[in-house]
UniProtKB/Swiss-Prot annotation:
GO terms for cellular component: extracellular region; secretory granule. Residues 19-24 form a propeptide. The active site is at residues 65, 110, 204. GO terms for molecular function: serine-type endopeptidase activity; toxin activity. GO terms for biological process: proteolysis. This is Snake venom serine protease CL2. Disulfide bonds join 31-163, 50-66, 98-256, 142-210, 174-189, 200-225. CDD domains: Tryp_SPc (cd00190). Coiled coil: none annotated. It comes from Trimeresurus stejnegeri. It is found in: Secreted. Residues 1-18 form the signal peptide.
Length: 258
């Protein structure tokens, strides 16, 4: 418990001085304490900050660009200033990536699977979120959450995670506004067209939940965050389920989807 408190104090510092390269929820409200049991915090003492999603007792899914040296993982956190009795801390034992040197596929390879150094115990504030059983539908209302910035122009982060509802759009909309995106991709396009609500610095790696299913990983946003007509980009989890399941089953040399 002493270690948890030390790490929690570090997290408070990170939320105050988080790097500008992370992502945060703009235009959202404080999450209910019971709706983010799978949300984890990835951070280190140098100021890096990201979210992630617990998918079973031993594995966390996040964005590849959230990889950082000396990574610490906190689970069961609601308030950075008030310790939950069931908060748990873990270190990464192994990290798995889908790296690509192909410009047409590097956009959608921003995914990292982390094996924890020891299993997590389910509790009141900690529970995994299962992988999706089917892909999401365009038009779905989806939920985002994280400790990212709540004001795009300020480097302040909330004490508790913020949540917001956004809409899933056709991929072609994001391709039209983000230069260099390929014709086909394993990326989801989601946001609010009028702007003002969306992921931002500090939210990277966190979940996109559509109709109760874990469908996306926060990957990239407009600059500034939640800009009108510029939805954010999310890695499509469904397309990687076979890769993820193979690694969990012990096949760590499995090939990523093309």
């Amino acid at each position: 418990m002493v270690l948890i408190r030390v790490l929690a104090n570090l997290l408070i510092i990170q939320l105050s001085y988080a790097q500008k390269s992370s992502e945060l929820v703009i235009g959202g409200d404080e999450c209910n304490i019971n709706e983010h049991r799978s949300l984890v915090v990835l951070f280190n003492s140098s100021g890096a900050l990201c979210g992630g999603t617990l998918i079973n007792q031993e594995y966390v899914l996040a964005a590849a660009h959230c990889d950082m040296p000396n990574m610490q993982i906190l689970l069961g956190v609601h308030s950075a200033s008030v310790l939950n009795d069931d908060e748990q801390a873990r270190d990464p034992e192994e990290k798995y990536f889908c790296l690509s040197s192909n410009n047409d596929t590097k956009w959608d390879k921003d995914i990292m699977l982390i094996r924890l150094n020891r299993p997590v115990n389910n509790s009141v504030h900690i529970a995994p979120l299962s992988l999706p059983s089917s892909p999401p539908s365009v038009g779905s209302v989806c939920r985002i959450m994280g400790w990212g910035k709540t004001i795009p122009t300020q480097e302040t982060h909330p004490d508790v995670p913020h949540c917001a509802n956004i809409k899933l759009f056709h991929y072609s909309l994001c391709r039209a506004v983000y230069v260099g995106m390929p014709a086909q991709s394993r990326i989801l396009c989601a946001g609010i067209l009028q702007g003002g609500i969306g992921s931002c610095q500090g939210d990277s790696g966190g979940p996109l939940i559509c109709n109760g299913q874990f469908q996306g990983i926060v990957s990239a946003t407009s600059k500034p965050c939640a800009h009108s007509l510029m939805p954010a980009l999310y890695i499509k989890v469904f397309d990687y389920t076979d890769w993820i399941k193979s690694i969990i089953a012990g096949n760590t040399t499995v090939t990523c989807p093309p």
